[in-house]
Amino acid sequence: MVRGPRNREKLQGYYDLYMKTGQIDPNVNPEIAASWQKSREVNPPTDRIRTDCRLSPETFAARQKLHRDAMMYLKHLTTGLRDFFKEYDISLLLLDDECVVLKSYSMPFYQMTPGEIEGVRVGLEQIGTSSVSMACELQTPFWVFGPEMWIRESHDSDACSA
């Protein structure tokens, strides 16, 4: 879901209110509000992404092999776009149906290099509300603005979409 520009200070205020009191401001997007509630229930960390939900090297290699065609397609598709990704600080990740990062094709995701993030599960249970968890839940691309994300280190981001 593509959404119009949002006021960062207001979004930060909504997030802070929810984190302190559990109260959701009526101006919070309903899908974001529902995701915040689910995030609070599963209680992922709020400070930064953890990589302890990483697949074993053998399991990860098997998943990559299963999705080899998609990985090769994106590799060829993104070859000419790397400068664009770099200029606009865009991350492009290929995830499987369990939100495991199969391949990182561009800029670091949450300041994590491809070697750090590949093989890591990044679903709602692991990182809370994010563009990834929203797209997975709603089965459609979703635009999430910095202060709406569960992980505080992402609050300075302009926006993320998945």
What kind of feature is each model-predicted range?
Residues 88, 97-98, 102, 115-162:
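Sensory/regulatory domains in signal-transduction proteins
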